[in-house]
Every structure is written in structure tokens, then in C-alpha cells.
Amino acid sequence: MDLPRRWLFRMLLLVATSSGILLMLYSSAGQQSPETQVPARNMAYPRAFFDPKPPNSENRKSRLCQHSLSLAIQKDRRFRSLFDLSTPVLLWEGLFTQELWNNLSQHKVPYGWQGLSHEVIASTLRLLKSPESGELFGAPRKLPLSCIRCAVVGNGGILNGSRQGQKIDAHDYVFRLNGAITEGFERDVGTKTSFYGFTVNTMKNSLISYAKLGFTSVPQGQNLRYIFIPSSIRDYLMLRSAILGVPVPEGPDKGDRPHTYFGPETSASKFKLLHPDFISYLTERFLKSKLINTRFGDMYMPSTGALMLLTALHTCDQVSAYGFITNNYQKYSDHYFEREKKPLIFYANHDLSLEASLWRDLHNAGILWLYQR
């Protein structure tokens, strides 16, 4: 082969070899090694504080969870010993056994069924017969690489003027509770509601107390789900009547028509019920207040907001908390929708100081993101 042809052949060979190397590098860059792949909640990248951004509707469910709270829990010595993400969050018929009845009959509500009618409990749970009733997001998750981002919106005055509405609505799911007024406050708190958490007592008290401020009905919507917190027999009776589409037959709410609160849809999939054992677990491990050992012990339970936020922390991959108590709570009104500033009052049935400390510590550990000003 003469010199020019030999030189040309070597140049072509060099180009082909270089192209192959580049192609291999490009291909490997688009793949993660087994050690860095993220299968849902349990294995993910370390949590970092994040500023929620609107998700891309086309690939939202296929994105990797790059800041999963589960790994942040694993990396924190204190919270690693407190969290048990395998704890059942919701109660449904499939979990209702004689053993469960015997156990929970030894504990007062909201931690059990002491003194409650077996027939009321059993007839309520029989209506929650689908496994879907035990899943907060409906059917069991089929996409292990999806990343569920949740916002839990409390009613704290810190949200007034916050302009967080768009960021709140950008989450996959939005939890609200009690007097969840959005009309007129869309810029600050958003409009999206995926879950509404309450006890019958807090729901009805909110409708009475905040009616003049704009809370004339609880959130309603086709894709909205209601999370009952079983603080008394009233919650079981209201839940049963809501699914059956009949008036409440007895108790303080006798004659109430649930559709006036929740709308005409009566499918069992519309309603969720927190497991009393889950509430016990949350109280024992995260919110074991000194109030329990005082004369107010029988009154004490975690606040509705605390239960919703901890529910999200046990079901979502990322959690942002808005409108929850912070160290500078005295700067703000009790609620964001109040026309005049009113101080936050600490009642004996909740330990808001303990809750504030917990939210701060979870934020500092990177397990949740707490909105602060």
C-alpha cells in the first residue's frame, strides 16, 4: 500500500475508534449504576431543601425521586429509630380481626375503641372492603420509580401575604384541613385540594366558627378524598352514613345528611380512615407530650394538622409543610384568613410547642421542607 493510501486508512481507523469510544461514554452517561438507581421511597439520593417547581405533566410519574425523605430518615440517628414506614396508616376491612378488636378495645379513642359499639365499628369497616381503602393514593403504586410530592397546608397566619399558592398547587397532592378557605386567598394558599383531613368535631366547629370569614362548606371535588380522624364514635357513624348515602342515625349528629358536607358521591373510595394504631404510634414516638401525665391527659391528642403532616410523611416521597407553627409565630395571626390579627392560643388538648419543635427538627434533618419567613 503506497504512503498516501496507508495514511488515509489509518486516519479512517482512528476516527471510527474514537466515535465508538464516544458512543460508549454517551450511552453510559444516560444510565445509572445499580448503586444509584432509586426504587421508590426506600432507596434514593440524600434529601436536600428544595423549592417546589411545577411538575412536567408528561413525565411527572416517571421522574426519579432525587430527594426522598426515606433516605434522609435513614441518615439521621434520632429519626431512624422513630420512623417505621411499614406501619399501616389507614384502616379497612382487611385489617379488622378479632385480635385487633380485642387489642383496640383496651384503649380509648382516638387510640382505640374502648366503650364503642362493636356493631358500629364492624358495619363501618365492612363498607371499606376494597384493598384500595387501605391505600392513600388509591391502587398500590405500580411505578417504583415515581416520586410523589405532597404539600400539607395548615391554616397558620404565616401564609397571609406569602404568595405561595402557585408552589403549593405544583405538588402532586395537596392536603388541607379544618377551616381550609381558599377563595380570596388563592395567591397565598393555592386552590388545589387532594385530601381534606378532619374529625367530625373539628369540621363542624370550623363551619360554625369561620362561616363569616368565608368557610361555608368543606372542600369538594371529583378527585378529592376525605380523611377521617376517628376521635369519637361520631366519626365512624358519619363515615358509615356517608358511604351508605343516608342520614346519621344516632348520636350528636343524628339527622345530619353527609352529602351536605361531602357532595353527592357516596363511593367508599372517596373516604379514608386513619388507623387508631397509627395515631398511637405517632403519639408515642413523635408527640408524647407531658400533658398526657396531667389532669388534661384524657383531652390530649395531636392536632389535626400534625396528624395530616405525619400521614404525608409516611406515604409521600417528598413533603412540604405550609402554614405550620414556627419559632416566630407571634408575628402572625392565628389563621391566614382572619381580617384582624388574633394571637395563637395554646389549649390543653394539643401541645403546639412540642409540634413546633418537631417540625423544626424534621426540617433541619432534611426530612421535610417547612415554609418559614
Curated annotation (Swiss-Prot):
Binding, CMP-N-acetyl-beta-neuraminate: N155, N178, S303, H335
Assigned GO CC terms: Golgi membrane
Membrane topology: Single-pass type II membrane protein
Name of the top EC class for this enzyme: transferase
Coiled coil: none
Disulfide bonds: C65-C147, C150-C316
GO molecular function: alpha-N-acetylgalactosaminide alpha-2,6-sialyltransferase activity
Cytoplasmic side: 1-6
Compartment(s) where it occurs, according to its Swiss-Prot or TrEMBL record: Golgi apparatus membrane
Function description: Catalyzes the transfer of N-acetylneuraminyl groups onto glycan chains in glycoproteins. Conjugates sialic acid with an alpha-2-6 linkage to N-acetylgalactosamine (GalNAc) glycan chains linked to serine or threonine in glycoproteins. Sialylates alphaGalNAc- and Galbeta1->3GalNAc-O-Ser/Thr epitopes also known as Tn and T antigens.
Protein name: Alpha-N-acetylgalactosaminide alpha-2,6-sialyltransferase 2
Organism: Mus musculus
Gene: St6galnac2
